[in-house]
Amino acid sequence: EIMNIETILSPHLEKCPQINELDEKKRKQLASIIGFVDETVGIEHLVKCLAEGTSMGGDGVIRCYVGFEPSGKAHIGWKVLALQLRRMIDAGTNVMIFLADWHAWINDKFNGNMEHIQTTARYMEDTFRALLGHPDEGDGAGQLRFVWASTIMDSGDYWARVLRCSKGATLAMVRKTFTIMGR
């Protein structure tokens, strides 16, 4: 076995001693999910979900995501990421790849040409499918799915939420977000 479970989990034990309470199968699943990544956000929650067989969706399916602004050709970094995503799929998580087409447009990728941005997003879908070995697609355990920002933003629910959040936001709150927005 390529992965040494204890080597992967030991850096997280101080922050999350509950890892030691997981049975061997769940420890192996956790090690596959987190792999050798530098940062694992919410490991305590993940361990709790594994221990209890629960999830945020209420169906026991652990979901993770990675997001991209469609902006160019595939490079070796995509393969490195795909190796980890494949381990996550094999460990029974649902992997969502978020294609941030509107974010790319805001940041003037392809000079703000949405048609080029969305062509690149479709290229990314095809590339990741191939890099991941064409896994089953859907919202279930061990499946892959792609979600586009434009699809979410076309939803009436999205705009209702934007308006509710905007109504409660102050100028000071908005200013705090500038550093993470990139503009």
Kindly give the residue locations of the regions a language model identified.
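NTP-dependent nucleotidyl-transfer catalytic core
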Residues: 1-183
